Amino acid sequence: MKHSLKYNLGIFTSLPLLPLLYFQGKNIRKNVPTLPEAKETTGFVNNNFSSDLHILTIGESTIAGVGVDYHKNGFTGALAKKLSTKLQKNIHWRVYARSGYTVAKVTTKIIPKIKETKVDLIVIGMGGNDAFTLNSPKKWLRDIENLIVSIQDKFPEAPIYFTNMPPIKEFPAFTKTIKFVIGNLVEIFGSELKNKLQSKKNVFYYDEIITLKNWSERNNLSHENSSIYFSDGVHPSELTYKIWANEMATFISSKFKA
């Protein structure tokens, strides 16, 4: 109820800003370079452990590795390396993601294409595109439910881990207006997801809100140079993928039962 009220108040506040959002969004799309998705969607981290783990990462542009050349240098590659060390397992990894996809599109366009039969854990990174398209929290939760069901139909035993929401309020390419409207909306999505998953078995959400200040302090990096975290003002840099993946690996390893 609290988050629905926050959303409704946000809509009321944002309505006069919609024309401005439209023109600012067009200007950002014109000025931000279109970066390709990362190459090589499969990999293997072999640390000579006695057993292997098979993981899938699923999602939007961040999981698709926009901002780096190869997935081994992006979120999934960094996640696999850190998980291998933390779980003492060799890691087979595979990426299923597409830039620009919402949760609904991932469910209908990507999940049916998954060919693997053996999967030990699944990581999902979503939220940005659903916020950019101004989906409501109600639709967001409905689409999340459909996504979870479609994955669990294929892999009923595999735990599912949702990453934090993207830190839209930190994107240097975005205007204050876009950060306010879209940034608040994606945080509502995160809160709604957290509440929903409390009653879900074997599905987890890392709910920490990402801030560059926290990341800089934890990793002894300068607070003054936010550009090191972004490849184009919107998508992560290789550094960001590594920091984000390492934190996600710590969260997963705290929940995962081999």
Regions found by a protein language model. Give the residues of each.
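N-terminal secretory targeting modules
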Residues: 1-56, 249-257
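Short, amphipathic alpha-helical "lid/cap" segments that border enzyme active or binding sites
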Residues: 103, 107, 141, 145, ...
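Generic structural signal for well-ordered alpha-helices
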Residues: 144-149, 190
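Short, flexible, mixed-charge acidic loops at enzyme active sites
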Residues: 215-227
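Conserved SGNH/GDSL esterase-like catalytic core that processes O-acyl groups on lipids
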Residues: 54-56, 62-142
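A short helix->loop->beta-strand "cap" motif at the edges of active sites that frequently abuts
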Residues: 155-159
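Histidine-centered active-site loop/cap adjacent to the catalytic His
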Residues: 226-258
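Substrate-gating cap/lid alpha-helix
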Residues: 170-209
